[in-house]
């Protein structure tokens, strides 16, 4: 079992040969209690058929080593999906891929898929929001499982939609099946979009003006290389960036979020991940390199 008291883990690989087994082994190495994967390349829609034998092996490994992992697998949808595009062909392509991703998420025993909601490009933002909600409804109707689509808060690059709680709530409100929709709060994205996250309780209170806290299904716990409101979306390691270690510790230990998986998506240092040390630091509330 993990010494990690928090429901805390990281993005891990999903590489050829071992796939989910490799993801679990990497998570155990970092002493994580949850993890997130892409089930294929983040930047394209190429996907290999999942090996059920490897999935079964991974499930067995999780049950033996840390049963919490089996309950807290998160999948991230590919970045190319844009359900808010003014182009119908782009929306249709994204919808079809999202359906594929939801079914793959279910196959690897995950119930949470994080989605970047999309960009308006040269169209009206409210029109884009309606497109996103409409296509989320179609994806949910087309998938016969209980996977929850978690709309991620965005940093505000270009014409990204979902850069504040109001926009995220409009998307969620447009989804008919509320059991299949949730939110992923990204600390770097919120900071970069201009949201003050120095006091999690205050931030959550502001969120609750738009949506119930029960909609928060995933936290992406990241520091930021940029000042608040920069709209840059450049993640930094915990304690190295402009958000700051003490504030991110508050997010990691917040009681209201105790049962929400917190995923590190921080950069490598010297070509190596430092997730294990970040998990130690966040648990102990003491920063060490």
Swiss-Prot record:
InterPro entries the record matches: AP_endonuc_2, AP_endonuc_F2_Zn_BS, Xyl_isomerase-like_sf, Xyl_isomerase-like_TIM-brl
Keywords: DNA damage, DNA repair, Endonuclease, Hydrolase, Metal-binding, Nuclease, Zinc
Enzyme class: hydrolase
Binding site for Zn(2+) 2: 152, 186, 220, 265
Any single Pfam family the record assigns to this protein: AP_endonuc_2
GO terms classed as biological process: base-excision repair
Cofactor: Zn(2+)
Biological function: Endonuclease IV plays a role in DNA repair. It cleaves phosphodiester bonds at apurinic or apyrimidinic (AP) sites, generating a 3'-hydroxyl group and a 5'-terminal sugar phosphate.
HAMAP family named in the record: Nfo
Protein name as annotated: Probable endonuclease 4
Organism: Malacoplasma penetrans (strain HF-2)
Lineage: Bacteria, Bacillati, Mycoplasmatota, Mycoplasmoidales, Mycoplasmoidaceae
């Amino acid at each position: 079992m993990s010494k990690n008291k928090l429901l805390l883990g990281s993005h891990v690989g999903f590489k050829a040969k071992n796939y989910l087994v490799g993801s679990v082994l990497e998570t155990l190495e970092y002493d994580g209690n949850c993890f997130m994967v892409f089930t294929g390349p983040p930047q394209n829609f190429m996907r290999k058929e999942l090996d059920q034998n490897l999935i079964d092996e991974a499930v067995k490994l999780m049950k033996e080593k840390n049963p919490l992992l089996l309950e807290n697998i998160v999948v991230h949808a590919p970045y190319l999906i844009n359900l808010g595009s003014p182009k119908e062909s782009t929306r249709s392509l994204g919808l079809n891929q999202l359906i594929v991703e939801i079914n793959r998420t279910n196959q690897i025993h995950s119930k949470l898929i994080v989605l970047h909601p999309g960009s308006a490009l040269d169209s009206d933002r409210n029109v884009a929001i309606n497109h996103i909600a409409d296509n989320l409804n179609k994806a949910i109707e087309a998938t016969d499982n209980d996977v929850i689509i978690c709309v991620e808060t965005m940093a505000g690059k270009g014409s990204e939609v979902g850069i504040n709680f109001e926009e995220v709530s409009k998307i969620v409100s447009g989804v008919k099946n509320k059991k299949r929709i949730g939110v992923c709060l990204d600390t770097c994205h919120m900071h970069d979009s201009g949201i003050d996250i120095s006091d999690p309780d205050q931030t959550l209170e502001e969120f609750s003006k738009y949506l119930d806290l029960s909609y928060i299904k995933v936290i992406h716990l990241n520091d930021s290389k940029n000042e608040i409101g920069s709209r840059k979306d450049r993640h930094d390691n915990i304690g190295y960036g402009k958000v700051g270690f003490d504030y991110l510790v508050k997010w990691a230990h917040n009681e209201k979020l105790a049962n929400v998986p917190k995923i590190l998506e921080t950069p490598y240092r010297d070509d190596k991940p430092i997730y294990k040390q970040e998990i130690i630091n966040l648990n102990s509330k003491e920063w060490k390199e």
